[in-house]
Amino acid sequence: MIIVAIDENNFKKASELINKLDPKKCMVKIGSVAFNSIGHEIIYYAADQGFKIFLDLKLHDIPNTVKKSIQGLASLPIKMLTIHTSGGKDMMMAAMAVSYTHLRAHETDRY
């Protein structure tokens, strides 16, 4: 699967790029540039166009903060999410536990 980065902080430019893509041939990556400026709006826009979303935030903090961050992102229509492994084993285990719970709860959703 080809992953296309949407590294725009302007919704119009980001949506124009998305409109040039085919959701059957690629998925889109929303990183910190886009997420910090137009995050939820561009994620929902891309999902509405049929794209799978890769949210590339490289979460890195204490285990409980990463866990709560993932819980906060759980309502978004994302397929993949990155964490930064230098956060350590406990952080990665907390992320995995909450992610697994989220995936099990949404097995029938469009993920």
Spans of features found by a protein language model:
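Conserved N-terminal beta1-alpha1 strand-loop-helix module at the mouth
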Residues: M1-L55, L59-K89
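C-terminal helical cap(s) of enzyme catalytic domains, especially alpha/beta-barrels
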Residues: A95-M96
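Conserved small/polar residues in nucleotide/adenosyl-binding loops
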Residues: T101-T108
